[in-house]
Amino acid sequence: MILQALTAYYEQLLKQGKVEAPGWDSKFKVSYELRLGPDGQLLALNDLRQEVPKGKKTVIAPRELPVPHRVKRASGVAANFLCDNTSYLLGADEKGKPERSRQCFEACAALHHKVLDGVDSPAAKAILAFFDSWNPAAASTHPLLAEQWADLNNNANLVFGYESPDGAHWLATTDDAIRAAWQSAFDTSDADAETARCLITGKEAGIARIHPAIKGVMGAQAAGAALVSFNAPAFCSYGHEQGANAPVSEYAAFAYTTALNLLLADRNCCQRIGDTTIVCWAENAAPAYSNAMLMFFCGGSEARGVSESDLAAALKALSQGRPVSFLDDKLDPNQNFYVLGISPNAARLSVRFFLHSSFGQFAKNLQDHADRLSITRPAFDKRENLSVWALAQETVNQRSRDKNPSPQLVGDLLRAILTGGPYPATLLNGVTLRIRAEREVTRGRAAILKAYYLRNYPTELNKEVFTVSLNESSNVPYVLGRLFSVLETIQSVANPGINATIKDRYFNSACATPATAFPTLVKLAQKHLQKMSTPNEVHFSKQLTELMAQLPETGFPARLSLPEQGAFEIGYYHQTQKRYAKKNEEE
């Protein structure tokens, strides 16, 4: 299903003229042009690199150009057509292995003769003449190369160019005769390959022995990683080798890898969260869909010129099945949409999840998630929404050396949000541990508690307790949380400037075993009330009386279950935020 969806995406891009035909890589980083004359002599070395913004500064980066399809190299010698590094095009490098460099150059020359022999093109003849006359031993001292030799050997890719006698010049990759010759060679390259019925297209075709590499996944090898590979006998069946174990045609292998590489290269289509790289796309290949989706669950809309209010309005409309205009495009809630999560695993990629639904259904799931997370927030917290990464960070000790949340948690949380499924138990466990360790109920942690119990245990009682702001529920654990917040306030007012409050010593015991903590705290509060001015004493005494009246006659509960502790923590958070809100209004 993944490969079929990616192949269909490639074919849609091909119809729209946004990608090259099979046999060509649409975007490949090229640093220099080797410009040749009619006799194959090197006329110039042209720097193709350009200035590109990177963060707040500008850097020099290679230019992305369409080039003939690249071979996947392991450890052997394998030449590319028209575009390669110095080892292949010049027969020299700084790796200290001149014999291997010579073999690379000879392999490259043989490939170009195989493709271009007999081609009626001045550029083709110039390239062949270059290979026939070039002296690799003199490459590093060539007057046109010596000054840039260090840069040329710093992982730079070079491409052939041609200059005619009248001064006109062009890249060999744009020469019509050369392109036609390469296309013919590529189309017949699998003539000797093993044939089988392709699992993606359903057609009999030559099977790809090794699939092209996937590049752009953070944490994977720089040379690329494989989504489909068989590198040990244990993975093979019925005597098949390599790609024959899962027959995918050369065309389909090229199509799905081209599509995925393009998505990974587009920051509007992919996002890294933890060790998971998320890639998303619409069936019609309109970029506005993936752009909007990443804004919905990763944030960052302001940087892309979309206000959070406009983003929220678009999400709500789509969740209700209404089309909206977004980024100069119209988003249709019925459009098929795909979300793929992949993680690096040495030379391979692991699929964390693959989801397919209508764009409107994804929007509804995200809207429901946002509604469950909604909770009153402190005045200093300006965030309208909490991103997936922000939620995962609430489970991490920010004082530890490793501040990254569990990769498994991030993947499970993403899946739950996008599918509308139950939140992972590890999310609740992580938040509960942090609250117990730090005795701090932050906005993020309170929002997670609220969302978790409303989604995983949608009882009427939970709907009554886990609300956006303070409510008058008589639920005992919730009332106890509010009571603890009031007791903490009484202590702070009676003893202004104290370094530690009852929260630091009693929060965990009051939350888990109220009967052991609250009698002591209530007695302590009576002493604190005696230190206050009359208006404050009357105000807080009234609050205490109202809350104590909602507790059972049997007294404080001996212990609270985990869900009841969640209600306690939400009650504490609500009451504390009410206090801060009132203080801000007075100021």
Question: For the regions a protein language model found, what residue spans apply to each?
Answer:
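Short microdomains enriched in Cys/His and/or Lys/Arg
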Residues: 209-245
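Conserved phosphate-interacting/catalytic interface
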Residues: 1-190, 235-587
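Short Cys/His-rich metal-coordination motifs, predominantly Zn2+-binding knuckles/fingers
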Residues: 201-204
